[in-house]
């Protein structure tokens, strides 16, 4: 039986919001194309730098838009997740 974790910073709820945000990006019109720019950049071997650049961009942009700051954080987190995916691909391709 798993012990219930009492998250101090509502991480469980925030992770749910992150997943919902990522799901929404896959439902946008340009995500329905056969290939996305991110796929081609990763296939060309430039994924890590691309993701790190976008993480920096959204971190630096955070707080500068009125009322839309959460979207910058969600994008930053999504690029961090893609970076983790790239690292797993470099190891053995399997996420355990």
How should each PLM-predicted stretch be described?
Residues 1-96:
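Intrinsically disordered, low-complexity regulatory regions
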